[in-house]
Curated annotation (Swiss-Prot):
CDD domains: Ribosomal_L25_TL5_CTC. InterPro entries: Rbsml_bL25/Gln-tRNA_synth_N, Ribosomal_bL25/Gln-tRNA_synth, Ribosomal_bL25_b-dom, Ribosomal_bL25_C, Ribosomal_bL25_long, Ribosomal_bL25_short, Ribosomal_L25_dom, Ribosomal_uL5_bac-type. One of its GO terms (cellular component) is cytosolic large ribosomal subunit. This is one of the proteins that binds to the 5S RNA in the ribosome where it forms part of the central protuberance. GO terms for molecular function: 5S rRNA binding; structural constituent of ribosome. It comes from Thiobacillus denitrificans (strain ATCC 25259 / T1). SUPFAM superfamilies: Ribosomal protein L25-like. Coiled coil: none annotated. The gene is rplY. This is Large ribosomal subunit protein bL25. Transmembrane segments: none annotated. Keywords: Ribonucleoprotein, Ribosomal protein, RNA-binding, rRNA-binding. HAMAP family: Ribosomal_bL25, Ribosomal_bL25_CTC.
Length: 201
């Protein structure tokens, strides 16, 4: 399901104008990328706040409507107030369906509770990273990537290159090369734990 974001062009710019916007329940933002000039926008704070709480909003191609004109974008940055539950600014990047995009996609960890390491060995699952950098065409962007921990023994880990990625999705070059561990089953306290194997060269 496509996620729609409603915005309007922001005519007044600068610190004072942004402060007044926030007092009025709006959030300043910008849309950039592609062959079109950057556009300053404003969005409803409450709608944006709730959208940002959803995982899919951060790893989906969004339909941004600016004064009724729609374009496909990715959320690239959201700045939050240091101690208030307030969004201060957002950045969106335009995407082209014919050009690959580079996105951080969240990981969903499955079946740890039925793994030999947990069920038989009494181990504790540990998630080392919660997202990975991938590249794909916009139409192939997954909301998340599954990490099946069901076969893990105590002390064993799953690495990035072990994951089954959706069709059309690949890890970016540096992640492929580094092949980081993404999850491990730690030995129970007092037990002997193997050191996770280093990724193959």
């Amino acid at each position: 399901m496509e996620i729609e974001v409603i915005a309007s062009k922001r005519e007044l710019q600068g610190t004072g104008a942004s402060r007044r916007l926030r007092h009025a329940g709006k959030v300043p933002g910008i849309v950039y990328g592609g062959s079109t000039a950057p556009v300053q926008i404003e969005l409803d704070h409450n709608a944006l706040y709730h959208a940002l709480r959803k995982e899919a909003f951060h790893a989906s191609v969004l339909s941004l409507s600016v004064d009724g004109a729609k374009e496909s974008v990715l959320l690239r940055d959201a700045q939050w107030h240091p101690y208030k539950q307030q969004v201060l600014h957002v950045d969106f990047q335009r995407v082209d369906k014919d050009h690959k995009i580079h996105v951080k996609v969240p990981l969903h960890f499955l079946n740890a509770e039925v793994s030999p390491g947990v069920k038989l060995g009494g181990g504790k699952p540990h998630h080392i990273v919660n997202e990975l950098d991938v590249q794909c065409f916009p139409g192939s962007l997954p909301e998340f990537i599954e990490v099946d921990m069901g076969a893990l023994e105590v002390g064993h880990s799953i690495h990035a290159n072990d994951l089954v990625l959706p069709a059309g999705v690949e890890l970016v070059a540096h992640v492929k090369q580094e092949n980081p561990a993404v999850a491990v089953i730690h030995a129970p306290k007092g037990g002997v734990e193997e050191t996770p194997a280093a990724p193959a060269a």
